[in-house]
């Protein structure tokens, strides 16, 4: 019984560690945001007709970026997101979510 409990704890700790690593890094996102700034502003404030990104929930930004990367809706955004890794997306989302 103790071995089963130990195994469960070890597996759970790996799962939690994987989630922690997937979290975005705002500083790394800022470094990647130069391409975004041309349409969304240097602080994510938005430049009409493009939406503001600053302060949006990171989960919403991650979903939108992944949808664009998969080709949903915008061919322009698809082209801009095609080369982003999942970690790049997490980082960009963390950066824009951190802005007010």
PLM feature spans:
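Axial heme c-ligation environment in periplasmic c-type cytochrome domains
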Residues: 47-54, 66-100
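N-terminal export/targeting leaders of redox proteins
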Residues: 1-23, 100
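Electrostatic cytochrome c docking/interface patches
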Residues: 14-33, 47, 62, 67
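The canonical Cys-X-X-Cys-His
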Residues: 34-42, 92
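Generic N-terminal leader/processing signal
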Residues: 1-2, 28, 54
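ATP/adenylate-binding site constellation spanning eukaryotic-like Ser/Thr protein kinases
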Residues: 58
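Regular, well-ordered alpha-helical segments
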Residues: 38-41, 63-66, 70
């Amino acid at each position: 019984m103790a071995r089963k409990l130990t195994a469960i704890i070890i597996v759970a700790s790996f799962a939690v560690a994987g989630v922690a690593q997937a979290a975005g890094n705002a500083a790394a996102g800022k470094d990647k945001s130069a391409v975004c700034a041309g349409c969304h502003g240097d602080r994510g404030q938005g430049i009409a007709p493009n939406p503001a990104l600053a302060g949006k929930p990171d989960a919403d930004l991650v979903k939108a970026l992944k949808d664009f990367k998969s080709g949903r809706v915008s061919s322009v955004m698809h082209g801009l997101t095609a080369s982003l890794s999942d970690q790049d997306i997490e980082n960009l989302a963390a950066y824009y979510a951190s802005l007010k």
